[in-house]
A protein has these predicted regions:
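Catalytic loop of the DD-peptidase/beta-lactamase superfamily, centered on the K-T-G motif
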Residues: 36, 74-149
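Active-site-proximal alpha-helical segments within enzyme catalytic domains
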Residues: 10-17, 55-78, 116-132
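Catalytic-site signature segments of enzymes, centered on catalytic residues
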Residues: 1-57
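Short, charged low-complexity intrinsically disordered segments located at boundaries
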Residues: 18-23, 48, 61-67, 97-106
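Carbohydrate-binding/catalytic loop surfaces
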Residues: 48-61, 105-115
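Solvent-exposed, flexible loop/coil residues
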Residues: 8, 44, 48-49, 58, ...
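Homeobox/homeodomain signature
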Residues: 16, 25, 35, 49-51, ...
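Stable alpha-helical elements in mature extracytoplasmic
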Residues: 10, 22, 26, 30, ...
Length: 149
């Protein structure tokens, strides 16, 4: 596509498209192709009343596992020498800022609900954290990271 606009509904539809094309629900698809190769031991997914993963929200993993996904992006789609995402996809994510917004310092970040954050440093470091911040005041940590980059 040419334009991108975030929409929870679009991600739910995408979840159903993955199921239709692959024959696997999105959570199983991600477990076999992404989460298991990343050695993610635990992951939970929010599901709709019909049992399909919502897609837009509700994938729960530990902070260190979230950092592994950042490492995949920093390494051009590979983890421990194994290709998990195509190089073309990773380039598009960074170029078009699909879910990874570009920061003023050249790094990229992805924020989640209630204070989850994944930050990819322009120096090759990956920083991930989860904090309960329903009021959205968690920018202090990001400001400190950017100040010390």
């Amino acid at each position: 596509g040419v334009d991108y606009q975030y929409s929870d509904g679009a991600y739910y539809l995408l979840s159903r498209v993955v199921t239709e094309l692959s024959g696997e629900k999105l959570d199983d698809f991600l477990r076999s192709r992404l989460l298991m190769p990343l050695h993610v031991r635990e992951a939970a997914f929010s599901k709709c009343p019909m049992g399909y993963p919502i897609g837009a929200t509700g994938m729960y993993v530990r902070t260190e596992d979230m950092a592994k996904l950042g490492e995949v992006y920093q390494n051009g789609g590979t983890f421990e020498g194994k290709r998990l995402l195509s190089k073309e996809w990773v380039e598009l994510v960074f170029e078009r800022e699909y879910e990874l917004a570009k920061m003023e310092n050249g790094g990229h970040c992805k924020g989640g609900m209630n204070g989850q954050m994944l930050y990819l440093s322009p120096h090759g470091r990956v920083i991930a954290w989860q904090s309960y911040d329903p009021e959205g005041k968690g920018n202090t940590l990001m400001e400190l990271i950017l100040k010390n980059e």
